[in-house]
Amino acid sequence: MGRTPWSALFFARIPGRLANYSDVTLYLRRLPHDYETEQPVFLTWRLYDSLPPDRAFPTAALASGQAFVAMDRLLDEARAGAFHLRQPAVADMIVEAIQYNGNILGHYASHAFVVMPNHVHLLATPAVALPKLTKSLKGITAKRAYAMLALTGRSFWQEESYDHLVRHAREFEKIRNYIEGNPVRAGLVKEASEYRWSSAGWLMTQGATGGSPADQGVRPTSAV
């Protein structure tokens, strides 16, 4: 039996209940940072002060899907930190940068994303090496956030990002549902499509003419 092409899986909208924390199981494998291929990856990065040092997970431990889900839950339940991404203008800017870096710069094809109050998830197929992809996204968004929020003298993003290889179609769908269901699990909305800073919400608001976040070709209103 031939291998199903990823292009046939990228934006298939498979119905089903979004996972909550109790039934989420992710089996994730950490990638080498020189990884570059046409196979999707699951990326996560968070604000610098989003977790206190005694609650942050060592990077190596996050190769475990169970540890990653536990960290994500801590981020969703966090009460400390600046929560800069809770501000609509900042969250809008992050979404614009995700679209711009994928659609205009061509660094990746975006399949799912969500901007949470203190972290970001992105499911994408890289067209460039991961260091270039993450450096571009984190660098330009940090620079613009500094200007928007008049921040000085501190980091915006945690230096380390988390990247995991998507190994097959079932995992692809599970991770996409996990990403788009994050605002529901965190209690921010009742339905994934209600959250405007995600691919699910984007499809409802920006994608009314059809297509997907990766093929709409929407350029940010201001240069990124």
Regions inferred by a protein language model and the residue ranges of each:
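Short catalytic/metal-binding and nucleic-acid-binding patches
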Residues: 1-224
